């Protein structure tokens, strides 16, 4: 199985993850400060700032783009419950 690296800068932890892993799944396990509510991409609570590696994430869905816009997300923000790590290295922090 292919792997990727995911770094949570707020807790200074880097983990190897299988490709396809959602950011929120590992955030919970490592104790990152990324909060969440619905886990369905509708509330915007898990907005996360992508510091590096956005090209290694799944494309945002129409729902994710709408929720980010409604919650004033910036160009480097994503919903941790929606985006999946596809490979390479990704570095994130709570938004």
From Swiss-Prot:
Superkingdom assignment: Bacteria
Residues annotated for [2Fe-2S] cluster binding in this entry: 38, 43, 46, 81
Signal sequence annotation: none
Gene3D superfamilies associated with the record: 3.10.20.30
InterPro entries assigned to the protein according to its UniProt record, in alphabetical order: 2Fe-2S_ferredoxin-like_sf (IPR036010), 2Fe-2S_ferredoxin-type (IPR001041), 2Fe2S_fd_BS (IPR006058), Beta-grasp_dom_sf (IPR012675)
GO MF entry, a single one: 2 iron, 2 sulfur cluster binding
Keywords: 2Fe-2S, Electron transport, Iron, Iron-sulfur, Metal-binding, Nitrogen fixation, Transport
Cofactor binding remark: Binds 1 [2Fe-2S] cluster.
Needed cofactors: [2Fe-2S] cluster
GO biological process terms, semicolon-separated: nitrogen fixation
PROSITE patterns to which the protein is assigned, alphabetical: 2FE2S_FER_1, 2FE2S_FER_2
SUPFAM superfamilies in UniProt: 2Fe-2S ferredoxin-like
Domain called 2Fe-2S ferredoxin-type: residue spans: 2-95
Coiled-coil residue spans: none
Similarity comment: family membership: Belongs to the 2Fe2S plant-type ferredoxin family.
Function: Ferredoxins are iron-sulfur proteins that transfer electrons in a wide variety of metabolic reactions. This ferredoxin is required for nitrogen fixation.
Protein name: Ferredoxin-4
Gene source species: Rhodobacter capsulatus (strain ATCC BAA-309 / NBRC 16581 / SB1003)
Lineage: Bacteria, Pseudomonadati, Pseudomonadota, Alphaproteobacteria, Rhodobacterales
Gene that produces this protein: fdxC
């Amino acid at each position: 199985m292919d792997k990727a690296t995911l770094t949570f800068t707020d807790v200074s932890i880097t983990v190897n993850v299988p490709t396809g892993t959602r950011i929120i799944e590992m955030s919970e396990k490592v104790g990152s400060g990324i909060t969440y509510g619905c886990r369905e991409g509708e509330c915007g609570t898990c907005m996360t700032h992508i510091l590096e590696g956005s090209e290694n994430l799944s494309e945002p869905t129409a729902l994710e783009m709408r929720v980010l816009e409604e919650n004033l997300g910036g160009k480097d923000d994503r919903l941790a419950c929606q985006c999946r790590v596809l490979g390479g290295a990704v570095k994130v922090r709570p938004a």
